[in-house]
Structure formats: structure tokens, C-alpha cells
Curated annotation (Swiss-Prot):
GO molecular function, one term: translation release factor activity, codon specific
Gene3D superfamilies: 3.30.160.20, 3.30.70.1660, 6.10.140.1950
Lineage, uppermost ranks: Bacteria, Pseudomonadati, Pseudomonadota, Gammaproteobacteria, Enterobacterales
GO annotations of cellular component type: cytoplasm
Protein family per UniProt: Belongs to the prokaryotic/mitochondrial release factor family.
Organism: Erwinia tasmaniensis (strain DSM 17950 / CFBP 7177 / CIP 109463 / NCPPB 4357 / Et1/99)
Protein name: Peptide chain release factor 1
Region (Disordered): 284-314
Function: Peptide chain release factor 1 directs the termination of translation in response to the peptide chain termination codons UAG and UAA.
Length: 360
């Protein structure tokens, strides 16, 4: 391992011990905000500190085994131990490289999840409903909370569009690779000839931003309409014009929120989504500029981004970005998504490592 990386790891280990001591201090415990911030930092440093400690141990094991090689009686055992220690050292080095990758500050945040029916009419809306149910099940398995903010239901079930907030630690980091186009191939229930149809939906995932990080929005750039809540998400239907639709005139972005009784609360929520959408659009523009020089696995939420195909007759899901196919479609639709999410997270980390290596 490079001396510069070892020095960085030693500094992080020292900081880990320092934070541990601070968490036991009565003054810090009394200051809840500081205590929470230090607890988060401690949790983030724990993995890298433990891994580095194991790597240091593997270096000592290598040194001991190399010294034993000069002893004829111990040589065979020493060679075996040396091989084991070197393999452990190599694996731990790789783990440490991943742990040292720059963290996306948004990864730990809540997120907004938007699912829209694309081509395919009623079948696309039904599939949008299936996708939303799939993500809701996944959120449930991770003990996240899903709050529907706006829903436009399809005529034969599902959704033309559904927007929800996913509340839970790490929600954005796990779901951010879902942004993009999702295709389904199956025989619709309304199909009498048994023909397979292809329909499409788009998914967009954006981090929920703290107020301080929301972009400045000029009130004169907004067109605000009120209407009566209807359908899922608006339980108190036809009572008052509490639902809100906000149009950001410079970008044409439209946001609706209808899940609260209070117009004021719906407006505040809609402005939060709008801010996240404006920032996401800016990030997508930057990513497009970067993607001319490197592959970009993070979708923009545009239908031209082809993420996955869900083929029901064959029971398979294919992720086109990393050429991954799994034959566990039923499990995936029930929210067991780690088999699809984990490989793309690993691929993304590998791309980051390759980019960092290129900078050295």
C-alpha cells in the first residue's frame, strides 16, 4: 500500500480514538446536537478503523512468517502462513480502498421517488403500480417509511404518475441507481390473443435536501395553482382546495402535492420537491458533460436511460448497464432488490477506483 494512503489511514484511526473519547465526555453528552454529529462520525470511522487494524495485523503476520522461513524445520508451515497473510493483506487493501472512496453526502438522506408510466397505455400504468409496490416492499424490508405525496391513478389500475418520499437512513444511496427507464415484457390481462407487449416506465430518485441547501427560487418564477385532492394520497377528497400544483416557469418543472389537509403544508412539501428537482436537473446536466469522458451508471430519470427489462414469460430481470441477468423476477417484484442493487453499487465503486487510479 502507498505510504500516503497508510498515513491517511493512521490519521483516520487517530481521529476514531479521539471521537470515542469525546463521546464519553459529560459536556458532549449534554449537548445533544454535538453528540449526534460525533456519533455519526464515529460510526463512519469505525469500519475503516477496524479494517486498517486488521491490515496492520496482516503486515505483522507477513513479517513473522518471513522471519520463520530461515528455519528449516519451520519453513513449510511458514510458507503456508505467509501465503494466507498475503492473501488477507490483499483483500483488506481492496476493502480499505473502497472505504476511502469519497462519500456522496446525499447518500444517507431521505429521497423522493417518482414513478411515471411511459409508452404502453394502461399496461404501462399497471406496471408503474407494480414498480411502486416493489420499491415500497423494499423500503419496508429496510424499515424505511414511504409517504405518498401525489398520485394520479391509471384507469385500469396502477399509476400514470406517483410521487413519494422515502424516509430512512441511506435511502437515497441505495435507490439512486434506479433512476432511468424500466421496460416490462409480458402478456397484459386485457390481451385476448396471448401476445407479449412491451411497455415502459421512468423512475426518478432525488435526495431530500435540507432547507439550507435548497436552490434559491425566485417567487416570481412560480405559478401556483390549487385544486381538490383526489385518489390515493388525498384521503380528504372534495372538501377544500388544499392540493397544490407549482410550475417553475424557467424550467417548466411541475410539482404537485395533495397528501396533507393543509394547503400551507402541501405548498411547503411541493417546494421541497421542486428544489430537489431543480438541483437534480443541474446535476444531470453536469453528469452528461462528464459522461463524454467516462461511463455514467447514475441515470437521469429520463426514458432514454435504459436501466432494466423485466421479462415475465422468462422470469428474468436484465440490467443493461452492467449486463447482469437474474432469473428471480418474482422475488424482485416482491421487493427483494439487493441482488440487483448490490452489483451496480460495486460496479460504481470500481469505476470510482479506476478514476482515482487514473489521477495518481
Amino acid at each position: 500500500m502507498k505510504p500516503s494512503i497508510v498515513a491517511k489511514l493512521e490519521a483516520l484511526q487517530e481521529r476514531h480514538e479521539e471521537v470515542e473519547a469525546m463521546l464519553g465526555d459529560a459536556g458532549v453528552i449534554a449537548d445533544q446536537e454535538r453528540f449526534r454529529a460525533l456519533s455519526r462520525e464515529y460510526a463512519q470511522l469505525t469500519d475503516v478503523s477496524q479494517c486498517f487494524r486488521q491490515w496492520q495485523q496482516s503486515q505483522e503476520d507477513i513479517e513473522t512468517a518471513e522471519m520463520m522461513l530461515s528455519d528449516a524445520e519451520m519453513r513449510d508451515m511458514a510458507q503456508e502462513e505467509l501465503q494466507t497473510a498475503r492473501a488477507a493483506s490483499e483483500e483488506l487493501e481492496q476493502q480499505l480502498q473502497v472505504l476511502l472512496l469519497p462519500k456522496d453526502p446525499d447518500d444517507e438522506r431521505n429521497c423522493y421517488l417518482e414513478v411515471r408510466a411511459g409508452t404502453g397505455g394502461d399496461e404501462a400504468a399497471i406496471f408503474a403500480g407494480d414498480l411502486f409496490r416493489m420499491y415500497s416492499r423494499y423500503a419496508e424490508s429496510r424499515r424505511w417509511k414511504v409517504e405518498v405525496m401525489s398520485a394520479n391513478e391509471g384507469e385500469h389500475g396502477g399509476y400514470k404518475e406517483v410521487i413519494a418520499k422515502v424516509v430512512g437512513e441511506g435511502a437515497y444511496g441505495r435507490l439512486k441507481f434506479e433512476s432511468g427507464g424500466h421496460r416490462v415484457q409480458r402478456v397484459p390481462e386485457t390481451e385476448s390473443q396471448g401476445r407479449i407487449h412491451t411497455s415502459a416506465c421512468t423512475v426518478a430518485v432525488m435526495p431530500e435536501l435540507p432547507e439550507a441547501e435548497l436552490p434559491d427560487i425566485n417567487p416570481s418564477d412560480l405559478k401556483i395553482d390549487t385544486f381538490r385532492s383526489s385518489g390515493a394520497g388525498g384521503q380528504h377528497v372534495n372538501t377544500t382546495d388544499s392540493a397544490i400544483r407549482i410550475t417553475h416557469l424557467p424550467t417548466g418543472i411541475v410539482v404537485e402535492c395533495q397528501d396533507e389537509r393543509s394547503q400551507h403544508k402541501n405548498k411547503a412539501k411541493a417546494l421541497g420537491v421542486l428544489g430537489s428537482r431543480i438541483r437534480a436537473a443541474e446535476m444531470a446536466r453536469r453528469q452528461q458533460e462528464e459522461s463524454s469522458t467516462r461511463r455514467n451508471l447514475l441515470g437521469s430519470g429520463d426514458r432514454s436511460d435504459r436501466n432494466r427489462t423485466y421479462n415475465f414469460p422468462q422470469g428474468r430481470v436484465t440490467d443493461h448497464r452492467i449486463n447482469l441477468t437474474i432469473y428471480r423476477l418474482d422475488e424482485a417484484m416482491e421487493g427483494k432488490l439487493d441482488a440487483l442493487i448490490e452489483p451496480i453499487v460495486q460496479e460504481y465503486q470500481a469505476d470510482q477506483l479506476a478514476a482515482l487510479s487514473g489521477q495518481d
